[in-house]
């Protein structure tokens, strides 16, 4: 159960990170 939650959070973090990278550029 915890693994599933962490995977979901990681996916969301990855998406947010991509947006932040484009903004930083």
Swiss-Prot record:
GO terms for cellular component: cytoplasm; ribonucleoprotein complex; ribosome. It is found in: Cytoplasm. Pfam families: Ribosomal_L41 (PF05162). Residues 1-25 are annotated as: Disordered. One of its GO terms (molecular function) is structural constituent of ribosome. GO terms for biological process: translation. Keywords: Cytoplasm, Ribonucleoprotein, Ribosomal protein. InterPro entries: Ribosomal_eS32. The keyword Ribonucleoprotein applies. Signal peptide: none annotated. It comes from the Eukaryota. Component of the ribosome, a large ribonucleoprotein complex responsible for the synthesis of proteins in the cell. The small ribosomal subunit (SSU) binds messenger RNAs (mRNAs) and translates the encoded message by selecting cognate aminoacyl-transfer RNA (tRNA) molecules. The large subunit (LSU) contains the ribosomal catalytic site termed the peptidyl transferase center (PTC), which catalyzes the formation of peptide bonds, thereby polymerizing the amino acids delivered by tRNAs into a polypeptide chain. Initially thought to be part of the large ribosomal subunit. Crystal structures show eS32/eL41 to be a small ribosomal subunit forming a bridge at the interface of the 2 subunits. Belongs to the eukaryotic ribosomal protein eS32 family. Component of the small ribosomal subunit. Mature ribosomes consist of a small (40S) and a large (60S) subunit. The 40S subunit contains about 32 different proteins and 1 molecule of RNA (18S). The 60S subunit contains 45 different proteins and 3 molecules of RNA (25S, 5.8S and 5S). This is Small ribosomal subunit protein eS32. It comes from Candida albicans (strain SC5314 / ATCC MYA-2876) (Yeast).
């Amino acid at each position: 159960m915890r693994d599933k939650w962490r995977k979901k959070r990681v996916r969301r973090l990855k998406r947010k990170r991509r947006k932040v990278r484009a903004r930083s550029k």
